[in-house]
Design a protein with these regions (language model features):
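C-terminal and inter-domain tail/linker signature
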Residues: 2, 6-14, 18-161
């Protein structure tokens, strides 16, 4: 029969052994909420450094492939619109993340090119959409793919001013 002191010593030794084990069973999440908030802040600021979160060959929801193509897409539209993203939901693990995001896209300068936004826009036009996005991470923790269903249009393009 083991005495109480022996049980406590055994339990303490076991917990020390568990505490010293490497944390390989639960890998760290590299694209956690804080990292996602930094990514969204860059997008909201119009700072193209947000593409630094992407793998070089990222696959983007709109059929774009590669970090350079995503950057070029945003460079082309930035003179005409400002986009503001609000995160309604976010979760992540070591392989990826999921988010529900509401986006307000506001036209700041007339755009006659329907290829950019599906129609010509006038300064003051605004659209609001909700997207459910899935982010797949590569082994380095960079975004390798962004996918999801077509966004829900909460407010079609209309002039607010």
């Amino acid at each position: 029969m083991t005495d109480r002191r022996g049980l406590l010593a055994g339990a303490l030794a076991g917990s020390v052994a568990l505490a010293s084990r490497p944390a390989s069973a639960t890998p760290a999440v590299r694209f956690d909420r804080a990292a996602y908030d930094r990514y969204i802040a860059l997008m909201n600021a119009g700072d193209l450094a947000f593409v630094d979160h992407y793998a070089a060959d990222v696959r983007f929801v709109m059929g774009l492939r590669g970090r350079a193509a995503v950057r070029a897409f945003y460079v082309r539209q930035r003179p005409y619109v400002r986009e503001r993203l609000a995160v309604d939901f976010f979760c992540s693990d070591a392989q990826g993340a999921a988010a529900e995001v509401v986006s307000e896209i506001r036209c700041i300068r007339d755009c006659d090119d329907p290829a950019l936004f599906g129609r010509p826009l006038k300064a003051g036009d605004v659209q609001r959409i909700r997207g459910c996005l899935l982010y797949v991470l590569d082994p380095a923790g960079l975004i390798a793919a962004i996918k999801g269903p077509p966004p829900e249009i909460l407010q079609p393009w209309r002039s607010l001013g």
